[in-house]
């Protein structure tokens, strides 16, 4: 009876240790992500290229590293932005800043937000696209606001690493297989 009780306590300790180790890994990853977000000034410091609109500069599946500390984006700079109301990051190049956009002066003067200065308004386009991105922007939006819409500017990349993310989103059954394999590995790893 005593050996049975002792083995149950030992199993409970092992299970608790595994749960705590798993929680430690998750919390460490979360802290690293948040630390990277603070360091780069971007809410999403790492993104994956989801389409071929920026070829040949970036291919689908490239992993991009972002930084969002500069107050202005320059023409030719590659930025990542979110369309208002949608949570899909778009990677495109800045083709115009406000002073170069003609006929928009009236709209700029009507903006009540004092932080929206001409240098904060951008027009973007994918390198592999024929037209600019005005069709992609939210309804009634003719340009991007640097502070509101831009997630960050590209500062580096690793080719093809993001394909794992693309595969998992395009084939949902792969998530189940991956979780199953990880679960089996955790069960077999008991010491």
Swiss-Prot record:
Residues 1-14 are cytoplasmic. The chain crosses the membrane at residues 15-33. It catalyses: Cleavage of hydrophobic, N-terminal signal or leader sequences from secreted and periplasmic proteins. GO terms for biological process: protein targeting to ER; signal peptide processing. GO terms for molecular function: serine-type endopeptidase activity. It is a single-pass type II membrane protein. InterPro entries: LexA/Signal_pep-like_sf, Pept_S26A_signal_pept_1_Ser-AS, Peptidase_S24_S26A/B/C, Peptidase_S26, Peptidase_S26B. One of its GO terms (cellular component) is signal peptidase complex. Keywords: Endoplasmic reticulum, Hydrolase, Membrane, Protease, Signal-anchor, Transmembrane, Transmembrane helix. The keyword DNA damage does not apply. Signal peptide: none annotated. The active site is at 53 (charge relay system), 92 (charge relay system), 133 (charge relay system). Its EC number is 3.4.21.89. Residues 177-188 are annotated as: C-terminal short (CTS) helix. It is found in: Endoplasmic reticulum membrane. Residues 34-191 are lumenal. It holds the Pfam family Peptidase_S24. Component of the signal peptidase complex (SPC) composed of a catalytic subunit SEC11 and three accessory subunits SPC1, SPC2 and SPC3. The complex induces a local thinning of the ER membrane which is used to measure the length of the signal peptide (SP) h-region of protein substrates. This ensures the selectivity of the complex towards h-regions shorter than 18-20 amino acids. SPC associates with the translocon complex. NCBIfam families: sigpep_I_arch (TIGR02228). Belongs to the peptidase S26B family. Catalytic component of the signal peptidase complex (SPC) which catalyzes the cleavage of N-terminal signal sequences from nascent proteins as they are translocated into the lumen of the endoplasmic reticulum. Specifically cleaves N-terminal signal peptides that contain a hydrophobic alpha-helix (h-region) shorter than 18-20 amino acids. The C-terminal short (CTS) helix is essential for catalytic activity. It may be accommodated as a transmembrane helix in the thinned membrane environment of the complex, similarly to the signal peptide in the complex substrates. This is Signal peptidase complex catalytic subunit sec11. It comes from Aspergillus terreus (strain NIH 2624 / FGSC A1156). The lineage of its organism: Eukaryota, Fungi, Dikarya, Ascomycota, Pezizomycotina.
């Amino acid at each position: 009876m005593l050996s049975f009780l002792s083995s149950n306590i030992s199993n409970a300790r092992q299970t608790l240790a595994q749960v705590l180790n798993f929680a430690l890994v998750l919390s460490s990853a979360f802290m690293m992500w948040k630390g990277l977000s603070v360091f780069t000034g971007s809410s999403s410091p790492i993104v994956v290229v989801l389409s071929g609109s920026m070829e040949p500069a970036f291919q689908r599946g490239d992993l991009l590293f972002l930084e969002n500390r500069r107050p202005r984006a320059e023409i030719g700079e590659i930025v990542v932005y979110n369309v208002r109301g949608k949570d899909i990051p778009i990677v495109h190049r800045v083709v115009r800043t406000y002073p170069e956009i003609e006929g928009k002066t009236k709209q700029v003067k009507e903006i009540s937000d004092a932080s929206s200065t001409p240098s904060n308004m951008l027009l973007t386009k994918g390198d592999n696209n024929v037209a600019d991105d005005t069709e992609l922007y939210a309804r009634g939006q003719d340009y991007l606001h640097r502070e509101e819409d831009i997630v960050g500017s590209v500062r580096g990349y690793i080719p093809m690493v993001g394909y794992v993310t693309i595969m998992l989103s395009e084939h949902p059954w792969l998530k189940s297989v991956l979780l199953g394999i990880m679960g089996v590995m955790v069960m077999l790893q008991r010491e």
